[in-house]
Amino acid sequence: MAARVCCQLDPARDVLCLRPVGAESRGRPVSGPFGALPSPSSSAVPADHGAHLSLRGLPVCAFSSAGPCALRFTSARRMETTVNAHQVLPKVLHKRTLGLSAMSTTDLEAYFKDCVFKDWEELGEEIRLKVFVLGGCRHNFFTSA
């Protein structure tokens, strides 16, 4: 299974934040074992995009303070191809989860610009919301009603 997530870099904490992105808005808040999720206006998802946050299809670790596991990280536009061809990002996120030294925020920004944003710019994408697929995690998945 995989989940659609929006990526946001938080330079204040030097962490990479992954936020769940729902495929459609149902007009009602979704809550889980960690409480209600923030409203779209306070999330990484622009309010005018129409996306909402949802627990559906997300692994338990997605809501951990240490961040989600990331064994596979792909562009939603190219589901069949891993964004990180050299398997760099999963190792970086795993090191951060363990509290080990990893890429700096500047290095991560450069990584995403080179590996992700460049592809979208070349494809002429107008929507700048970056949606990724996080998968390969061994944790259990939520299935919201």
Curated annotation (Swiss-Prot):
Reported modifications of this chain: A fraction may be phosphorylated in insect cells and HepG2 cells, a human hepatoblastoma cell line. Phosphorylated in vitro by host protein kinase C or mitogen-activated protein kinase. N-acetylated in insect cells.
Signal peptide limits: none
GO CC terms: host cell mitochondrion; host cell nucleus
Residue runs in coiled coils: none
Pfam family, one: X
Region of interest (Mitochondrial targeting sequence), ranges: 68-117
Localisation: Host cytoplasm; Host nucleus; Host mitochondrion
Keyword Transcription regulation tagged: yes
Domain of life from the UniProt record: Viruses
InterPro entries: Transactivation_prot_X
Subunit and partners: May form homodimer. May interact with host CEBPA, CFLAR, CREB1, DDB1, E4F1, HBXIP, HSPD1/HSP60, NFKBIA, POLR2E and SMAD4. Interacts with host SMC5-SMC6 complex and induces its degradation. Interacts with host TRPC4AP; leading to prevent ubiquitination of TRPC4AP. Interacts with host PLSCR1; this interaction promotes ubiquitination and degradation of HBx and impairs HBx-mediated cell proliferation.
Family: Belongs to the orthohepadnavirus protein X family.
Name of the protein in its database record: Protein X
Taxonomic source organism: Hepatitis B virus genotype C subtype ad (isolate Japan/S-179/1988) (HBV-C)
Lineage of origin: Viruses, Riboviria, Pararnavirae, Artverviricota, Revtraviricetes
